[in-house]
Regions:
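C-terminal segment of N-terminal export signals and the immediately downstream linker at the start
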Residues: 40-67
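Periplasmic-binding protein-like
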Residues: 118, 122-131, 151-153, 196-199, ...
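Extracellular/periplasmic periplasmic-binding protein-like sensory domains
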Residues: 266-347, 360-362, 420-435
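Segments of small-molecule ligand-sensing domains
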Residues: 328-343, 354-416, 436
Length: 436
């Protein structure tokens, strides 16, 4: 590929407004960084096709630095993939999308400030993003205050669509209780009845811990103990060394760099040899596998997305998505990792928004209520927009339910053990919207 072609690709991938700072370039190759800088001055080649059509402004807040940076960067790739594909195919309602990116630095206070800037200064029409659950929780009231639609794209904390729900926020993928009810029967029925949980000690880890305690008990098992480990802990040994006793399996709830840390250190301490080893699939995301090596062998996890072309995922639409994602991920990681669930859910979140905007004839902020009504009950059919599978965005709480994949790592690769249909993951709504 020529330098000119590379620049064009990155021009399309990074068409957003803002200054190019050193922080924005962290994690990109020098060639890609150069191309990124160029796009601040040169519009994407397809932009001219829209003439004078006013672009929709979509804000996306992601952790591009700090504890969540590794996942935040792949999440951003998913957003960009969808936006570029939409713009190349004629936009939404004949208008292009302009993407405005904010780095929340993996900090709730920074995230809230950045979201307020997106809404007040950048004047975005809608927002798609949110990675760390504590940041999602901090920002949700802001979207409600300014009456702007917020499509959550990674955060899994249970309360986002239950006790802390609001009319302006939607989650078009799974959440902690759905994963737990899908996985607990396998854990108890095929691996062991007594479990010990180690978890990331913040909103997501805590709500996921609670969900598994409940569902393992319902399945006939027992959680005999749990230990929280602060987010970003580089040396987990002082915590892991406290884990001992008579139980069958160790269950981990971690992601990103912390997933690599516990995978390696639990192995080194002999915990994954002494006990069955299972957990949230984020521990063994495709982007983590190289750093885990053979220490993750035999791990059993659950995830909404696994990058394999087998069974129900052996479809033309999934192959197209996976191949496209590998090309885009290679631009930030030369090893060309397979896509993770963050790429998938962000890609599909943008596409869900597109459907809602088309259905409502959305023009801008003045049509926010029309957009909300279009998104409530939105049916998303498996295909190029939604390669993960069918889903419906429930009207009562803005929560979707999707099929889940139980998998293990065999010879360094993903192997699907069970596919749990979305119908088996459904919980009754537990949300009361405040009148707007």
């Amino acid at each position: 590929m020529t330098d000119e072609a590379k620049t064009q690709d990155w021009g399309e991938a990074f068409w957003y407004r803002g200054k190019v700072t050193r922080r924005r370039l962290i994690g990109y190759t020098s060639a890609a960084a150069g191309a990124l800088g160029a796009t601040m001055l040169v519009p994407a080649p397809w932009q001219a096709a829209f003439g004078q059509a006013k672009p929709y402004k979509i804000g996306t807040e992601q952790p591009l630095s700090g504890a969540g940076a590794a996942g935040g960067k792949t999440a951003l790739v998913g957003v960009q993939m969808a936006v570029d594909r939409i713009n190349k195919s004629g936009g939404v309602n004949g208008r292009p999308i302009e993407l405005i990116v904010a780095d929340d630095e993996s900090k709730p206070d920074v995230g809230r400030r950045k979201v307020e800037k997106l809404l007040v200064e950048d004047n975005v029409d809608v927002h798609v993003g949110g990675f760390l659950s504590n940041i999602c929780l901090a920002c949700m009231p802001v979207f409600e205050e300014y009456k702007i639609v917020n499509i959550i794209s990674v955060c899994l904390d249970t309360t986002l669509t239950t006790t802390k729900c609001n009319r302006y926020s939607f989650r078009p993928y799974d959440y902690a209780p759905a994963q737990a009810v899908a996985f607990a029967p396998y854990l108890v029925g095929k691996m062991g009845k007594k479990w010990y949980i180690a978890y990331a000690d913040y909103a997501w880890g805590q709500s996921t811990r609670d969900a598994y305690i409940q569902e393992i008990k319902k399945a006939g098992g027992e959680v005999v103990g749990a230990i929280g480990i602060p987010l970003g802990t580089a040396d987990m040994t002082p915590f892991l060394s406290k884990i001992s006793g008579d139980f069958d399996g160790l269950f981990g709830i971690f992601f990103g760099k912390d997933g690599v840390t516990i995978g390696n250190q639990a192995y080194d301490l002999g915990l994954t040899k002494k006990y069955k080893w299972a957990g949230d699939g984020a521990i063994a995301e495709s982007t983590n596998l190289p750093a885990l090596g053979n220490k993750i062998e035999g791990f059993v996890g659950i995830n909404r997305y696994v990058p394999v072309l087998e069974g129900v995922l052996n479809t033309p639409s999934h192959k197209k998505f996976r191949d496209y994602a590998v090309v885009r991920l290679k631009q930030i990681d030369p090893s060309g990792p397979l896509p993770d669930r963050y790429v998938q859910s962000n890609y599909e979140a943008i596409n869900a928004l597109k459907l809602g905007m088309e259905k409502s004839g959305f023009r801008g902020r003045e049509d926010t209520m029309k957009l909300i009504e279009a998104l409530e009950g939105l049916e998303m059919k498996e295909g190029d927009d939604f390669p993960q599978g069918d889903k419906v965005l429930r009207k009562e709480d803005h929560q979707a339910f999707i099929r889940e994949f139980v998998f293990d790592i065999k010879d360094g690769k993903f192997r699907i053990l069970e596919v749990v249909p979305k119908e088996k993951t459904i919980f009754p709504p537990d949300c009361k919207f405040v009148a707007t």
